[in-house]
Amino acid sequence: LVSAKTETVGINRITVVVDADELNIEQITKQLNKLIPVLKVVRLDEETTIARAIMLVKVSADSSNRPQIVDAANIFRARVVDVAPDSVVIEATGTPGKLRALLDVMEPFGIRELIESGQIALNRGPKTMAPVKN
């Protein structure tokens, strides 16, 4: 579950990712539509959606293994956002699978702290969820 600002001031988009059958998805949609402040419920199809999450992970690091950690982060197109004498903080964005793979690579070094957001998503191509502006 993620709530995020949109291109329209005062309107936030809530992204809810569920693993459910069609009947349960319909029920969730109906319940969301009953909420007064909800303007619109849009169901995104996995094949036509770009979805990403962000993760910050603090990894134990010293002068001997820091280059390996940085190289591994670079392979995943992640960024080192903080370096301390005994740790490195890495910022990564991507699919849950990509983030899990990065964690798997960092695990042997020692994960000291981790926080991961839920996913945000948009349709691929020109289709938008926002009303068309003239």
Please state what every model-predicted region is.
Residues 1-13, 17-134:
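Long, contiguous binding/interaction regions
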